Amino acid sequence: MALRSVSRRLGSRILNQRSFVASLHSHATSFGFQEVKEEEKSKLVGNVFTNVASSYDIMNDVMSGGLHRLWKERLVGKLSPFAGMKHLDVAGGTGDVAFRIYDAVYSVKRRALQKVDEASLEETQIYVCDINPNMLNVGKQRAAERGLRDNKSLVWVEGDAEALSFDDNSMDGYTIAFGIRNVTHIEKALAEAYRVLKRGGRFLCLELSHVEIPVFKNLYDLYSFQVIPNLGELIAGDRESYQYLVESVRRFPPQERFASMIADAGFEKVEYENLVGGVVAIHSAIKL
Amino acid sequence: MYRTAAKRLLAGGGITTTRLLRLPKLRSTIIPSSYTSGLCTSSIGGNTESPMGNQSVNPNQSGPTASSSTGTGEGQRRHESRKPRAEFQEEQARVLSASLRHVPRLGWTEEAMMAGSRDVGVSPSIVGSFSRKEAALVEFFMDECLQLLMDRIDSGLDLQNLIPSERIFKLIRIRLEMQVPYMSKWPQALSIQAHPLNVPTSFKQRAMLVDEIWHAVGDGASDLDWYVKRTILGGVYSTTEIYMLTDDSLEHRDTWAFLDDRVKDAFDLKKSIQEAKYFAEDIGAGVGKSVQGLMNGVMQTMSRRSGGSAF
C-alpha cells in the first residue's frame, strides 16, 4: 500500500516533469508553425536575421505603426537607468534599447536635476550582445551616425543568449527586447540572465505576446497573418522571414506561463504589464 | 483593508498548489494592466493597486514564511546548494532603512536610496523597481515612526497621571521629535506626500497615526464624534508639523509652546461645542426630546415666521 502510494507519487512527478519538459521542448523544436530539429533552429533563426538586418528598423516601424518606439521607451523608463550602471542588452543588435539607455543616463537635463558624479558617469557600461554579426553591424553603423562610434560606454559584443561570455554577478540590468522568442532554449537564456545579474539587478523582457480580448484578438490575428507577410514581401523582399515572425509569436508561451518560467529561473517579484491589450508584454523581475 | 485581507487569503490558499510554488507571491504582485496604444492613459486604479500590495509591509508576511519553506523543498528537487531566498519586501525594507541615513545629506531622492542600496550590498538597480520611488522612502519612514511610537506607548509611557490634553501633547511631541534629524529635508517629504499619486497612502498613514494617538489617550469623557476627534487632532498635528519647519529655537521650545496652545484650543473648542450642544438640546427639549424634534421645531419656527411675514 505504501509502495503503491510512493509509486503513484513518483509517477505523477515524472509525468509532471515529462510534460514540463515536453512543453519547453516544443519551443525548442518549433520554427514558427514548423517542426524542426533543435540543432537546426538556431541556424534557421540566424538566416532570418541575416536576411532582415538591413530593413529591420523600417519593418518595425511599418508593422507596429511606429508604436515599437513607445514600447521601448516604456521598457527603458521601467529600467530607470542610472550613471555608473553596467547594463546588458541581449539580442539588441540594432541598438534601439541601448541608445535609449545611453540617452537616459547621459541626458543633460537629468544630470542637472540630480547631483550626478562625473566619475560614476564614466563608469557606465552598456553592452549590446547579439548572436548575429549583421545585426551588430547595423547597430555600429547607427552608433557612428550618432557620433558614438568611439564611445567607451557602448560595447558591441557578439554572443549567444544561452551562453553569455560575461562574468557572474556583473550586471546591474539585463534587457531583452523582441529577442527571447528567437532563442532555442528559453530557460537557458533565463538561467544565463540570472547568472550574470548582480544581487538586486533587474531583468526586463519586452516581447510580443498573447491577446485574449475577444474581438481584438481576431483583428490582431487577421492583421498578423494577412498583412504582415505581405508587407515583408513588399518592403524587405522576404515573405518567409515575416511569416516565421508571426508564427513564432503564437508559439511563444503566454504571459502567465512565461512569468512562471522566469520565477523558476530564480527571480523574485516577477511582474508583467500588457501593452496594447496584450500585443506586447513587458515582464520584469529582480534577482535577490 | 479588504484588499489586503483578500491578498492574504490568496497567498495562503496558493501555497497548497504543488506545481508553481512561487506563484503565491506572483498572485499578489502580478497586476496585468492594459494600456491603450500610444496614449498611455494608464488607469490610476490599476496603478494604485500594486503599490498597496508592495508598500504595506505587514499583510504579505503570512505568505513569505510559508513559501520560503516550500521553496526550499522544491529547490532540493533540482539544485541542492541554493542559498535561502531573500523576500523582496524584506530587501526593500532593508534598503530603505539604510537609505534613511543618507537623507539629511541627499534628500528624499533616488540618490539616497541608491546610496542605501550600496550600503546593504545590493545593486542600485533595485531602486528602479520600487513603486513611486521617493514616496516609497517617505512612506517607509512614516510607518517606522508609527511603529516606534506604538512601541514607546506599549513599553509603559506614563500617561495615567496626565489629563487628556497633556497626554495628547506628550504623544504628539514624541512623534514629532522623531522627525528632528530630517528637519532640513522635511519640506521635501511633505511635498512628496502631497503629490496626487501619493495622497491616498499618506492620508491613510496619517489617519492611522491619529487613530493610534487617540487610542493611547483613551476616549475620556468626550462627547464628540469619532471623525471630528480625529480631524481636529489631525489638524493640530499638521499645523504643529509645519510650524516646526521654520522653528529655530533651542530644542524647538517654540514648537512645543505652539503645540500646547493648539491642544488647549482644541479642548476649548470641544467645550464650546459641547455647550452649544447642550443649548441646542435645551431648545430641543422645548419642542421635543430628539434632534429630529429640534429640526422640526426649526422648520416649524421658520414656516411660522415666513407665514407671518407674508401678511
From Swiss-Prot, chain A:
Pathway info: Cofactor biosynthesis; ubiquinone biosynthesis
Cellular component terms (Gene Ontology): extrinsic component of mitochondrial inner membrane; mitochondrion
Residues annotated to bind S-adenosyl-L-methionine: T94, D130, D160, A161
Entry keyword Cell membrane: no
GO molecular function: 2-methoxy-6-polyprenyl-1,4-benzoquinol methyltransferase activity
Location of the protein in the cell: Mitochondrion inner membrane
EC id: 2.1.1.201
Biological role stated in the UniProt entry: Methyltransferase required for the conversion of 2-polyprenyl-6-methoxy-1,4-benzoquinol (DDMQH2) to 2-polyprenyl-3-methyl-6-methoxy-1,4-benzoquinol (DMQH2).
Record-stated family: Belongs to the class I-like SAM-binding methyltransferase superfamily. MenG/UbiE family.
Quaternary data: Component of a multi-subunit COQ enzyme complex.
Protein name, UniProt field: 2-methoxy-6-polyprenyl-1,4-benzoquinol methylase, mitochondrial
Source organism of the structure: Arabidopsis thaliana
